[in-house]
């Protein structure tokens, strides 16, 4: 055993390249949740050189308690591990087996719509003589909840809508805690374990207590959405402190002894007062000022032209790798689930058992993330009055600040025509994506009488096509010389073919053929491929196009609005489809609504002008930055004469833009 060197020879820290999204500072205090990278094995050094993530760097702190140790390979592995753990829930759970299980549990408590005296039984059993899968209206099943007659397919759709509603509210409420204080990792683990345990609890749901299944679905989906928002909030920090970003070249990183950090006690805590009030982007974006008076004695390299591209490429690389790892886990577990269901003859117990394994997978592979991810605390919450008040750190303060930040961002977005058009289109498109998926699965189960293992195979095909589409649409766009918004329009047009194909089943001539128009189970497989292929293009190009329209310096706030629009929109589509099914007794009429929902975003996307949006965003960014600098100067002058400054005394919140001041600024620019 090699003895530990008590007095290591310290090497000087190498030059680092400054970056528009990076800032080095003191390390943070330790935490019980913190990854122990100080004594990593040599296995951790493969891809990033020496594991210098624990190296103390004697430079000014951006805010009290900041952890700016370099991102280590182990920390990246922890980030990937959670994607590997949780992605199976959305692919195998919400995307496939949870709606099937909810419908089946309700069906075993329901009666036939055509004959209320007859119990429904399983929807995957053989059809009565003379009844083909495409016109199985007489096999529709209903349950009664609180005196209301609800179709069993609608029951699953309503449950999903409620889960998305709670998810959207929770995501907004915790967004501030994700960026401020030391709650990011703790909340991630709380929601991860809560969601995985409730998913495992599906094993205990018997048909007599089928409503409990809806409760578990709502809780698990809400926890999943919240945990992924928290996981994504780690990405900018991992990129910011990555050696490739800090030292300006992909292959250069310093070599410091791993135990060096042990000799330096923490110098700040989150409870200390600050000389500067930070806005909601503090944890994700860089600032031009630091709190510490200690000078940065390192000699930076000249700022290279590709400094920003290094960060962008690294962020894309890490994100893409995480998505690939998550999809691989989802596909693997989906195949295992299909085998389990096939071996157990597609019983309700087999569905519950599969959901138990999905929750167990989520739980077990969250443990490496808990061990390897660092907390990476954000700046303390900006106080709104007495800076010594503990109320500024209370959960109520976090929640109020989160919602007020959202409203401020909405006010800014309303001033940008192209962002408004895009967000309206994305709201409809995101709702259409979620609603088409859930409707198709339930249509295949209730009207085409497809077995659960066959439904699982549809999801495998769609997921595989999604991966293929993510890579293929870039090549298609280059080959056809399409602009980003034109590529999105092409995806929408292909997407529209899915509900239109389902509507062909209403044509008398097609009905006589007994094929085409979703009258046979095998027709679901090519449609599943189309859905996945289109989704791969929409996901990447919509986010990319939106990024082009964001005012520089407001990326975090606007991407939060983008995510909330994505999460919140799916409340409406499934609920409307459920109401249509309850009113007509069939799912096929819902394809009329889906056709409209898929088509509505197209004209909005068509009128988005990227160049105009960039110009508007740049002008707004100048106005925002001008008022931030002015407020910073006022705060600096007043802070020198008094220890505590109230925002009310200053006259306005430094994060808000005065419409009158903006109007005067616009007139001044026009005069110039």
UniProtKB/Swiss-Prot annotation:
Query: Mainly resides where?
Result: membrane
Q: State the GO CC annotations.
A: vacuolar membrane
Where in or outside the cell is it found? Answer: Vacuole membrane
Q: How does it sit in the membrane?
A: Multi-pass membrane protein
What ranges does the record give for the region Disordered, renumbered to this chain? 1-66, 634-672
Which is an annotated Pfam family here? Answer: ATG22
Q: Known CDD domains for this protein? A: MFS_Atg22_like
A biological process from GO:
amino acid transmembrane export from vacuole
Record keywords: Amino-acid transport, Autophagy, Glycoprotein, Membrane, Transmembrane, Transmembrane helix, Transport, Vacuole
Record's InterPro entries?
Atg22, Atg22-like, ATG22/LtaA_families, MFS_trans_sf
- Which residues are connected by disulfide bridges in this protein? none
Q: Where are the transmembrane segments?
A: 82-102, 154-174, 187-207, 211-231, 323-343, 353-373, 421-441, 456-476, 490-510, 515-535, 545-565, 590-610
Glycan attachment residues as annotated in the record: 20, 288
Q: Could you tell me where the Low complexity compositional bias lies?
A: 19-32
Q: Where is the composition biased (Basic and acidic residues)?
A: 38-59, 647-672
What family classification does the UniProt entry report for this protein? Belongs to the ATG22 family.
Summary of the function given for this chain in its UniProt record: Vacuolar effluxer which mediate the efflux of amino acids resulting from autophagic degradation. The release of autophagic amino acids allows the maintenance of protein synthesis and viability during nitrogen starvation.
The name this protein goes by in its record:
Autophagy-related protein 22
């Amino acid at each position: 055993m090699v003895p530990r060197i008590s007095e290591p020879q310290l090497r000087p820290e190498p030059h680092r390249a400054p970056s528009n999204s990076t800032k080095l500072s003191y390390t943070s205090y330790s935490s019980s949740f913190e990854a122990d990278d100080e004594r990593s094995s040599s296995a951790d050094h493969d891809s990033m050189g020496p594991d210098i993530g624990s190296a103390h760097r004697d430079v000014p702190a951006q805010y009290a308690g900041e952890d700016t140790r370099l991102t280590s390979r182990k920390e990246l592995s922890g980030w990937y591990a959670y994607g590997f753990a949780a992605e199976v829930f959305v692919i195998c759970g919400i995307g496939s087996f949870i709606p099937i299980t909810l419908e089946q549990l309700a069906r075993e408590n329901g009666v036939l719509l055509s004959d209320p005296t007859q119990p429904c039984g399983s929807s995957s059993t053989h059809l009565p003589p003379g009844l083909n899968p495409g016109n199985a209206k007489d096999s529709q099943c209903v349950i009664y909840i609180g005196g209301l007659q609800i179709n069993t397919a609608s029951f699953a759709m309503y449950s999903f809508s409620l889960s998305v509603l709670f998810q959207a509210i929770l995501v907004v409420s915790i967004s501030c805690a994700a960026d401020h204080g030391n709650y990011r990792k703790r909340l991630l683990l709380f929601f991860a374990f809560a969601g995985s345990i409730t998913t495992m609890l599906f094993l205990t749901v018997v048909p007599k207590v089928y409503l409990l299944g809806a409760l578990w679905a709502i809780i698990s989906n809400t926890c999943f959405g919240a945990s992924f928002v928290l996981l994504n909030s780690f990405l900018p920090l991992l990129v910011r402190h990555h050696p490739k970003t800090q030292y300006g070249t992909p292959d250069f990183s310093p070599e410091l002894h791993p135990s060096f950090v042990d000799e330096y006690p923490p110098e700040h805590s989150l409870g200390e007062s600050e000389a500067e009030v930070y806005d909601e982007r503090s944890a994700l974006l860089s600032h031009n000022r630091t709190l510490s008076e200690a000078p940065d004695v390192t000699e930076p390299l000249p700022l290279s032209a590709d400094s920003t591209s290094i960060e962008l490429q690294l962020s894309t690389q890490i994100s893409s790798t995480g998505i690939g790892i998550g999809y691989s886990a989802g596909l693997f577990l989906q195949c295992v689930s299909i085998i389990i269901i096939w071996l157990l003859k597609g019983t309700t117990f087999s569905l519950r058992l599969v959901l138990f394994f999905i929750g167990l997978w989520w739980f077990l592979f969250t443990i490496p993330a808990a061990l390897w991810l660092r907390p990476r605390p954000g700046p303390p919450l900006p106080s709104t009055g007495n800076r010594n008040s503990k109320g500024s750190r209370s959960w109520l303060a976090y929640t109020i600040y989160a919602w007020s930040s959202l409203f401020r961002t909405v006010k800014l977005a309303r001033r940008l025509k192209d962002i408004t058009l895009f967000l309206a289109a994305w709201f409809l498109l995101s709702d259409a994506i979620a609603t088409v998926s859930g409707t198709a699965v339930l249509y295949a189960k209730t009207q085409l009488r497809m077995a659960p293992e066959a439904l699982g195979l549809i999801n495998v095909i769609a997921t595989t096509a999604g991966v293929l589409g993510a890579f293929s649409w870039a090549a298609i766009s280059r080959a056809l010389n399409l602009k980003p918004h034109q590529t999105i329009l092409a995806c929408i047009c292909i997407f529209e073919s899915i509900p239109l194909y389902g509507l062909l089943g209403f044509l008398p001539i097609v009905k006589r053929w007994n094929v085409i128009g979703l009258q046979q189970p095998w027709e679901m497989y090519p449609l599943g491929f189309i859905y996945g292929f289109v989704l791969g293009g929409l996901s990447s190009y919509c986010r990319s196009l939106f990024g082009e329209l964001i005012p520089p310096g407001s990326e975090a706030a606007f991407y939060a609005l983008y995510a909330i629009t994505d999460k919140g929109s799916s409340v409406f589509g499934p609920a409307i489809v459920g109401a249509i099914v309850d009113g007509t007794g069939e799912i096929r009429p819902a394809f009329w609504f889906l056709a409209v929902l898929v088509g509505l975003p197209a004209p909005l996307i068509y009128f988005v002008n990227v160049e105009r949006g960039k110009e508007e965003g740049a002008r707004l960014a100048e106005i925002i930055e001008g008022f931030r600098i002015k407020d910073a100067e006022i705060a600096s002058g007043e802070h020198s004469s008094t220890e505590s400054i109230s925002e009310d005394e200053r006259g306005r919140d430094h994060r808000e833009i005065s419409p009158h001041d903006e109007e005067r600024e616009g007139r001044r620019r026009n005069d110039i």
